[in-house]
Structure formats: C-alpha cells, structure tokens
Amino acid sequence: MSSAEFSMDDFEDTFDSNATISTKDLFEGSDRLPLNQSINTTIQNLYLPNGGFAIGDQSQQQYYQAMPPLNQSDQFNLGRSNNLTPRTNQLQQLQQQQQQQQQPQQQQQQQTYGTQSPIHMSQTPSSPLSSPLPSPTPFSRQQSYNNNNSNNTSSSQNYNNNNININNNNNNNNTNNNNNNNNGNNSNGNNGNNNNNNNNNNNNNTNNNNNNNQQQQQQQQQQQQQQQQQQQQQQQGNPNLSSPQPILDTIYKLLSEQEQTLVQMIHEQSLLLNRLPPTLDENSLAPLKSLSQKQITLSGQMNTEMSALDATKKGMILEPTDLAKLFALKQDLQIQFKQLSLLHNEIQSILNPQHSAPKPNVALVLKSQPFPVVISKGKQLGENQLVVLVLTGARSNFHINGPVKATMICDSHPTNKNNPTTPLEMDSQPIYPATLTAHFPLKFLAGTRKCSVNLKFGVNIRDLDNVTTTVESDASNPFVVITNECQWEGSAGVLLKKDAFDGQLEITWAQFINTLQRHFLIATKQDPVRPKRPLSSYDLKYIQTHFFGNRSIIHQQDFDKFWVWFGKSMQTLRYQRHISTLWQEGIIYGYMGRQEVNDALQNQDPGTFIIRFSERNPGQFGIAYIGVEMPARIKHYLVQPNDTAAAKKTFPDFLSEHSQFVNLLQWTKDTNGAPRFLKLHKDTALGSFAPKRTAPVPVGGYEPLNS
C-alpha cells in the first residue's frame, strides 16, 4: 500500500502541510509588512542601514533613538573581525533586559521556596552543540565597558584603602607628638615644631576626609541616576521586555548573514587549501590561522544566539507562531554550527595534524523532522517530513558508498537487536546529488511499548585511500509508536515529560507551557504556525492554579499528577469524533471551574448551557444548564460513555436530541484576546455536524413527504 492510500488522521494530515515551511517563510511569509516593521526596528536599534525595510512604529523608534550610538569601529562584516557583531551585542542586551524582567519572579520564588531554592535556572546549561571548537572569549563592547567599570571600582577601593592608611599614619604621628609633649620636651623650638606638625597633619586629615566625602557623594549620585533610569524604563513600558520579537528577528537576521558568511568561508578555504605548497611554512599557514580565528569568533556568536533562544524558551511564554519561529531558528542554527565545525576541523587537520581525527570530514544532519510525536503503527511519513542533509568541508576528498540507512534506537541501542521484526520500512534511501539530501517516507511496522525512541542515520564514506568509514547523525527528537489508540494517553505523557524536562528534575513554568502548547497543537491536529484555538492564557492560568498551586517551578512529580487528569482530556480531544473540531469552534468551552460556570449562567434563560471538561471525572464532559423548573436553577449533567456509545451517534447528536439544551454559550474572544461568550441556538452552532441526508428518489409515481 502506498503512502497516498493512507488517511493521515494521526498527525500527518495537519503536520505534513507545514513540514516544508522554511524559516524564511515563517518570518517573511505572504504578509511581509509586520515582519519588516519588526526587523526594521531591530536594525534601527542596532544603528545599521535598514536596506529598504518598512518603517517601524513610533513608540519603538522613540525607544531606539534614546539609546547611545555604537562606535563605528564596532561595525564589521561577519567572519572578518575578531569581535562580535553589534547585533550580537544587542542580543546580549536584550537577554539582560529579560533577566531584569524575571528578577521579581525570582524574588517571588525565593519567598516561596526560601533561600535554598530547589532549582537554579541560571546554572542550567543551554542545549549543547557538539562542537570541537574551543569556547571563545566574548569581545562585546558592553562587556569591555563592564570590565572597565570593574577596574575603576578596584582603583577606587585601592584609593580608599590608601586614604585609610594615610589617616592612620597621621593619627599615629599625632599620638607620638602628643606623647613627646607629655614627656617633657618643653623647648620652644620643639614645641613649635610639634605644633606645626600637628597642624599639617590635621590639614592632611581634613583634605583626606573631604576627598572621601566627595567620592561618596559621587557614588551616591551615580546610584541615584541609575535608579532613576531604571524607573523611567519601567514607566515607559519597553516593548522589548515583554515580547520575543526583537530577539527572534535579530537572530533571523544574523542567520541570514551567517549563511552568506559560511558560503564565503567555504570558497575562501577551498582556495587556500588548493594553493598550499608541498612544504608548509609560517607564511603559508598564516591565512589558515586567520581564517581559523574567524571561525572561532563566529562559533562564539552562534553560541550566544543559541543561549538567547534557550533563555527565551525558558523565561517567556510564547505564542504558537513565535514557538514555531524559535524551533525553526534553532534547527537552522544547529545546521550552521555543524557546517562551521566541519570547516574548522578541516583547517585544524593541517595546523594540528597530530590532534586531528583520521575520519572523513562529513556529517549527516536532520534538515526537517516531524518529531516529537506519537505515531500509530502502520502509518507512513510524508515525502518531505523527514529529510537528511549531507554536509562536507571545503574539499570533497571522499566517495559515498551506498544509500543512507535509518535505525531506530532506544537508550542508544538499536530496537531490533533482539527483535526479529523489522520496525521500519523505507528505511534506506539514496542521496540526491543536486541537493545532497535523502528523503525518508518511513513506515512504522512495530510499536515501541510506550517507550520513547529516536532515529539515527548512517552512511558509508570511502576516502581516497579506499578506507571505508561509517558516518552517523545525531539522534532525532524522540517519538513513540503505538499499536492501539488506548495507548496514546500514556505514550503522549511519556513523550511530553521527556521533551519538557529533558533529564532535569525541575523546570520553569514558561518552559513547561511552551512544550505543552506544542504537543497540544499536534494532538488536536491544528496548524502549529497559525492554530485556530491553542491553549489561551486563561486556559494556562486554570492549569497553573488547579494543578501546580500557581508555582513558577514545575517538578516531575507535579507533572505526573497533572497528566492523570489532563492526559485523558487530550485523549478525548484527539480520538472522539468531532471533539477536536468542537473545541476549535468554541462549542466546547473546555477548562472552567464550576463556580465560573455558575457565574456565567446567572440571569440566563432556561435551556442555556455550557460544555466543559469535568474536574472530578477526567476525560468526560460536564454540561451546565438552566433548568425549566420554577424557580429556575443551574443543573450539571455528566455525559456518560453510553450517551454516545452507538456506532453512528456522536456528541453533537446527543446535544441535538435533548430538549433541555437550547441555547449554547460558545467560547470566543474579543479584540484584546480575552474570552467571552456568544449565545447561539444549538441548531445554528451544531448545523455543520448534522448528518447529511439525501432525499429519496420518487419511485412509481409516488411523491416524497415535504418537511
């Protein structure tokens, strides 16, 4: 059976359409104006030419104009200086602004957990890029300024210490002089000398005290000015503190420049390597050393960008579109880092041949992947969902033997080691010479028993000495293959927990929610870039209040208790017929407490109802409605499994059949994004879910009944 014959109702039906969306499409799609405004304001902030982008809004321009201009010497082309770019400096400033914004949250955490906080996110390393490059020393202008301030502070401290020593010496002199006077040195000459010495010492003390007072006053004035500046920034409501757009757009611009820089590096490095003389000397190695230093500097810039992306994910709750942008940037950045590492390894094999590995300078990277996701046994990926890219250095002194092979691994071991059943089909694919890519429309033939697994890809490379070496890729994102839909809840929980915590015992609330939102959109089969109804800020507040005690730090044990309830609601949203669509249309209000329901139904007509998830019965719906009895009161009905147990009876059918339910309070949102109710008759709200019946064809002269 071909892939086209499968109904991709698990995740492929929605996810495949977005699998080939590039980072450029995400940032510069059909609607270019909003992006151009954002990029333009970022460029203005960095005082670089905008290249014809649209003008940003007035409030952002005013903020950027208030910033001090950069020195002309700080601006240069990537790969042609030992300093970081002004945009990287600005990236560090944006990170510092985010940290300042998160300080009140950290203070609240200290009040909650005490000084012995169970987690210190500032010490958590960012996602590592397996790079052989040494850690570069940052050369940002801002850090140099901070270093100068540190030196000035040290000098001030030394100066104060000197003053203290001088005062002590003078006091000792005064004491000695007084002792001399008491010991009977009564000659007029001696007395005059002593008096003069005392006067001089007193004058010195006065001068020193005046200097100390002036320094203290200057320090106090500087502190007051800094406090006033911070208060002004808080009053102005700087948009950079609450929006990820400046960081995301800046990194996107950097990625575009880095792509051009890498192409130039490959060309330059190829020329240098091809022109090397047989006997190497200092003059022939100097250009390679210079290029190697540029690569180290560029790797430092990439590390800064990766740290900024990780900090954004951990410190700020992102909208779905921004989440998609962040992961696309991270994917492209990892590929660029791998390419840079290959170029650097190639130079190091000449500069330091004794320390270089004798393997081909080739790498396999995942250009696109649909994971993390739960996949049903027998499903097949789309043609462009899983693509492997071959990267090389500046010289292609090797031959590729055979196709690229995919292997499923669990805990770093192949899953089919002791299993005779082959878990994958279409697991061997050729490399397209024009693009150096291999496309894997994998078909999954066996379940993974609720265990998360990964994919690795390998290819045989033969060098010029006819030595064959296997080159392997890094592991893919995790996924789980299930054999029955009843396994989905447990498998999705395993996958979400692994993806969110990544081996850590505790994570920030923002990091947890960003991961949950991503998995929720996949589970409800929504467009991950522009979903119709993701989890709103009010849904997230409900979750944080009811399951995590409004804490800003989430522990794995907290997650286990949360998933017992939330996982069942996700299972219902995913597999029960029409439920995902009912959620997206707002017919199911979703996550709402009983008291909130009672407040919403106050003063409503009899028959008005709201649909929500039951708080005490996970995965089931509760319907709150106004009864027809007098006096009217709010009733609550728990939808039973047998209410929709018939083969063709759906939840909309159940609502249509019961006269107690007349007018639906449908979830919608106002212009500010706040939820509100829209009152509709149930026939209007559920009309699209009614079964389509065709009129019978008249037979033998009989006429059909008219309704």
Swiss-Prot record:
Keyword set, alphabetical order: Coiled coil, Cytoplasm, DNA-binding, Nucleus, Phosphoprotein, Repressor, SH2 domain, Transcription, Transcription regulation
Record feature DNA-binding region, as residue ranges: 443-487
GO biological process: one example: culmination involved in sorocarp development
Record PTM text: Tyrosine phosphorylated in response to cAMP. Not tyrosine phosphorylated in growing cells. Tyrosine phosphorylation is first detected at the tight mound stage, continues throughout the slug stage and early culmination, and starts to decrease at mid-culmination. Barely detectable in fruiting bodies.
InterPro entries per record: EF-hand_12, p53-like_TF_DNA-bd_sf, RHD_DNA_bind_dom_sf, SH2, SH2_dom_sf, STAT, STAT_TF_coiled-coil, STAT_TF_homologue_coiled-coil
Highest taxon above the source species: Eukaryota
UniProt modified residues of type Phosphotyrosine: Y702
Signal peptide range in chain numbering: none
Site feature (Interaction with DNA) residues: Q380, R577
Function statement: Transcription factor that binds to 5'-TTGAATTGA-3' elements in the promoter region of target genes. Functions as a repressor of the ecmB gene. Regulates the differentiation of prestalk cells during development.
Self-association and partners: Monomer, in the absence of tyrosine phosphorylation. Homodimer, or heterodimer with another family member, when tyrosine phosphorylated.
Protein name, entry field: Signal transducer and activator of transcription A
Organism per entry: Dictyostelium discoideum
